[in-house]
Amino acid sequence: MSSAQQQFERIAREVIEDSFRMDPVGATWMGEHAFDSLLPDLTKYGQEQFSQRIEGYLAALDAVDDVELALPDLVDLEILRAFLTSTYFDVTQVAAHTWNPMLWNPGTAIHLLLSRDFAPLEERMANVADRCENIPDFLEQARNTLEEMPAIHCETAIAQLAGTRALLESLDIQPQIIQSLDQHVEWLKEQLPFAHKSPRMGSE
């Protein structure tokens, strides 16, 4: 194995692990269960740190001597570069974590663990409990991160959170977790009169 191939494979492993850690719900959906106890870090600080790491990954890929790579590895390198470039755009330009309240709905994080029989129920329920315990802090982070929102996104998030509440009520969890969800829904309702952001991308 050439040094270039070793370098590329190391970068690829770091990118995959970092991406799964930043999106543990997506990781659960894709069948990677190392982060099943976590909720995403969608805070401004977390996303800024992630964007800086992406810049580092892209610089590291540029430093790989691709002349030494076999064709399959060269193709994989360009796929990884495209993924990082797209993710960087999403984080820094789209920045949906600052205006799309639907991203802050913890319901999918819980539902995936309950609906997929990938591990014994006891193990999955332990991760459900961990994710549920993080919900109050997660929703507080949402309120500290979300800025002006499109009305349609705000209204849809409120409707979807009703389903999340029903899901949480079916579980034996602490009442304050459901109360934190109710508090967040009330906050979203308070934001509706000011939710004038256009859902379209770009300035025109």
Predicted feature descriptions by range:
Residues 1-204:
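N-terminal maturation segment of proteins
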